[in-house]
């Protein structure tokens, strides 16, 4: 059984921007970028002005994302998202890895498939 890797990206989002953000990712997910990173599932969440982006992939997504930051599709998506998404902590944000939450606990039911 293949291990699923996860990354949770945390940022701020503009009020009312969820449909626009979802549309940008729907367009991007139809291209090659998810395959380059190994994304198998993506979920976007909103909690007030907090943007939560859960990536599930077949390999650790952090290093894979770092490898594609200069890819034209990544740059285009990132540029378009700046209209709606801003760093959670602008003082410490330097690259996408600075927006990734640190997983400190995981439990999985050993009997679940």
Over which residues does each language-model region extend?
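Short glycine-/aliphatic-rich beta-strand segments at the starts of folded cytosolic domains
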Residues: 2-15
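Hydrophobic pocket/interface hotspot
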Residues: 9, 21, 53
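Glycine-rich beta-strand-turn "strand-cap" elements at beta-sheet edges
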Residues: 2, 40-48, 77-113
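Short amphipathic alpha-helical segments
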Residues: 13-40
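An amphipathic, aromatic/His-enriched active-site/gating alpha helix that lines ligand/cofactor pockets
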Residues: 31-39, 58-95
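A broad, low-specificity signal marking well-ordered, structured residues that form hydrophobic/aromatic
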Residues: 7, 42, 51
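Short, charged/polar surface micro-motifs in flexible loops or helix N-caps
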Residues: 15, 50-51, 57-63
